[in-house]
Amino acid sequence: MLESICKAHPKLMVSDYEIKEESQPRTYQTLCYLKEKGYACKLLFGSDKLPELKTGWKHVEEIAKEFGIVCMARYDDDCEKMILNDSYLSSLSQYIEIVHTPKEYHHIYSSEARKQFLIAKDAIQILQDTLPKELHGLSSYLFSEDNHEK
């Protein structure tokens, strides 16, 4: 699914690097891997994550200096002010690019998408555990775009 989305957007790509690793690599490791493969990368996140950089992330300075950070401003977040009022973020400000996204995209969060995906995945597993094996293909039918009203 993601690969088909990327076909329409040449600047995007899908990598299975993190999935294939034995343990979950840190963001910095993933960015280094992609750089080794010849890709130019930056860390992209929403403004809700900006305050977490100091305490919730590892290798932040390395990521900022080696790759750069792109922060998507959401809702009425004043990212410039958030950075200015925080000494840690201010020290990284030259590496942070603020992107003001259109309002129709403010509600889109990758963490929420992952959460909903896991809920759906669990529901499919419950469905498969409940139904006879002959009906296990039902989940692909239920989630096919051809079977949804538009």
Identify the residue ranges that each predicted region occupies:
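Nucleotidyltransferase catalytic core that binds NTPs
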Residues: 1-150
